[in-house]
Amino acid sequence: AYMHEGRTGASTINIVFQRELGKEATQEEIESIYHEKSILFNSYPEAERMPGAWELLQKVKSEGLTPMVVTGSGQLSLLERLEHNFPGMFQKELMVTAFDVKYGKPHPEPYLMALKKGGLKADEAVVIENAPLGVEAGHKAGIFTIAVNTGPLDGQVLLDAGADLLFPSMQALCDSWDTIML
């Protein structure tokens, strides 16, 4: 499952349908399954902030940089949780969600859309990703990509996906941020 993190919901559902049923999911099936998944997601208690994430975002903003969210999700509840956990940190009009793109990660379109929304060139941005598909998408978009291994995968998987740098945790990235940005 972690290898598919970052895909749009529709893409993930189609992969499962093809693997398990040998067919494409209909639009109605996708909507029904995504709806059920959203209900399940919202039934879970709210996750705590990842250690180092808030401090890193504060450093980013203090340097005059604009943090942006690029997610394969389209769940309003996820975006609301981001605002709750990181108040005032992200501008909704600069977020890229599943509804903004035709192709999800690992396609570069989500990050290319972020560049467009932010009025940036690839060499003016940095991607921070925790999943192989997101790392691959950032790399394919030509953006310097930092991988943070927050999951069960071997770090080499993230490097093989195209990460320029790899950190074992968000806290480790935060602690090294000033050195990286020199």
Language-model regions, residue ranges each:
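Conserved acidic
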Residues: A1, E29, P45, N130
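A short hydrophobic beta-strand->loop->alpha-helix junction that borders the nucleotide-binding pocket
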Residues: A1-Y2, A98
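A metal-dependent, Asp-based hydrolase signature
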Residues: M3-F41, K59
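Conserved donor sugar-nucleotide recognition element shared by glycan-biosynthetic enzymes
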Residues: G9, R49, H107
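Alpha-helical structural context
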Residues: V16-E20, Y44, N85, K117
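Asp-based, Mg2+/Mn2+-dependent phosphohydrolase catalytic module
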Residues: Q27-E28, W54-Q58, G74-L182
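Short, acidic loop-to-helix structural element flanking the phosphoryl-transfer center
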Residues: I39-V69
